[in-house]
Curated annotation (Swiss-Prot):
PANTHER family: PROTEIN FAM199X. Keywords: Coiled coil. This is Protein FAM199X. InterPro entries: FAM199X_fam (IPR029672). Residues 255-300 have a biased composition (Low complexity). The keyword Coiled coil applies. The gene is fam199x. It comes from Xenopus tropicalis. Belongs to the FAM199 family. Residues 237-253, 338-349 have a biased composition (Basic and acidic residues). Residues 318-337 have a biased composition (Basic residues). The keyword Coiled coil applies. Residues 237-350 are annotated as: Disordered.
């Protein structure tokens, strides 16, 4: 085969480039495709730039490209048959897989093995067309040529651990972090919303053997002291003695007497009006009396609520003031302890006080029998 045989493709701007040029007639048994005027085109594409571009064979599905000189020589050198009748029979069958286009070990064989994973050559991806026949046309959609690759299934999203409501959990069902968090929440709630008596009661519930001196400014709660039953008692005690519950209970006690009296008056007026049925004036008068009594009850209730809210605000201010004083005392105590530790460390490192001995001296004053005259 001559060196000029199949040396290049035609320019890519021509609509249907020929695959080969006419070869030498001296070589026997060599099939020259141009003898029959055959053209290779895509059955789905009308734009040749997607197949041949800048004299290179572009394989977009694999992301690789092979030089046209290498592919063309190996591609057409293997298509050799005995006579022209066999060539016509091969061309009429339009079975592209019957040709040994890519010999074993060639440059294009590796490409063909990778292409076979994406394209099925038996579906007549390419077809041979004779001159004068209609050109196959199709939609210019990339999905017609390159098959869709199934996407990998989406990974299941990780479920985030929701924050549990610790007020409803028993003590044994909490983790260590949740127990520490809930103890801090309870101590902050009790110290800011309750008085000294309620705090002592809660301490006695948690640790009945705890001994608290009047000078103690804080109480440390150990995690192993709490149980499910103790935590249940603490929660019920906080619910009963919280400022909001206490204010609503006191307001209910104060308004119970006024509501009882107004309900008695309204019930009497309604019964008298329903029994007599004399005129509509009596019913309107009774309804007016009921509205007046209800308005007076509402006024007394709002007045008591305002007093309770003022007392609750004052109690909260006092608790904040006490907590601030307690923090200042703790800070001063910590500062004094750090100073003593620092001084002891300095003395130990200097070595000047290793042989120190502490002696106690006591002086007994002698009682003088008589007065001493200073003027003499």
């Amino acid at each position: 085969m001559s060196e000029g045989l199949y040396e290049k493709f035609l320019a890519p701007d021509e609509p249907f480039p020929l695959l080969s040029q006419r070869g030498s007639a001296s070589e026997e048994g060599c099939l020259d495709v141009s003898d029959f005027g055959c053209q290779l085109s895509s059955c789905h594409r009308t734009d040749p730039l997607h197949r041949f571009h800048s004299n290179r064979w572009n394989l977009t599905s694999c992301g690789t490209s092979v030089a046209s000189s290498e592919c063309s020589e190996e591609l057409f050198s293997s298509v050799s048959v005995g006579d022209q009748d066999d060539c016509y029979s091969l061309l009429d069958d339009q079975d592209f897989t019957s040709f040994d286009l890519f010999p074993e070990g060639s440059v294009c064989s590796d490409v063909s093995s990778s292409i076979s994973t994406y394209w099925d050559w038996s579906d007549s991806e390419f077809e041979w067309q004779l001159p004068g026949s209609d050109i196959a046309s199709g939609s210019d959609v990339l999905s017609d040529i390159i098959p869709s690759i199934p996407s990998s299934p989406c990974l299941p999203s990780r479920k985030k651990n929701k924050h549990r409501n610790l007020d409803e959990l028993p003590w044994s069902a909490m983790t260590n972090d949740e127990q520490v968090e809930y103890i801090e929440y309870l101590s902050r709630k009790v110290s800011t919303e309750m008085g000294l008596r309620e705090q002592l009661d809660i301490i006695k519930i948690i640790d009945p053997t705890a001994q608290i001196s009047p000078t103690d400014s804080e109480f440390i709660i150990e995690l192993n002291c709490l149980t499910d039953e103790k935590l249940k008692q603490v929660r019920s005690y906080i619910k009963e003695h919280s400022p909001r519950q206490r204010s609503t209970r006191e307001s209910w006690k104060r308004t119970s007497y006024s509501t009882a009296s107004t309900s008695g008056v309204s019930g009497a007026s309604v019964s008298s009006s329903s029994a007599s049925m004399v005129s509509t004036a009596s019913s309107t008068g009774s309804s007016g009396g009921n509205s007046a009594s209800n308005s007076s009850a509402n006024m007394s209730r709002t007045h008591s609520d305002s007093n309770l809210s003022a007392s609750a605000a004052e109690r909260i201010r006092d608790s904040k003031k006490r907590s601030k004083q307690r923090k200042l005392q703790q800070k001063a105590l910590r500062k004094r302890q750090l100073k003593e530790q620092r001084q002891a460390r300095k003395e130990r490192l200097s070595g000047l006080f290793l042989n120190e001995e502490v002696l106690s001296v006591k002086v007994n004053e002698e009682d003088h029998e008589g007065d001493v005259d200073v003027l003499m």
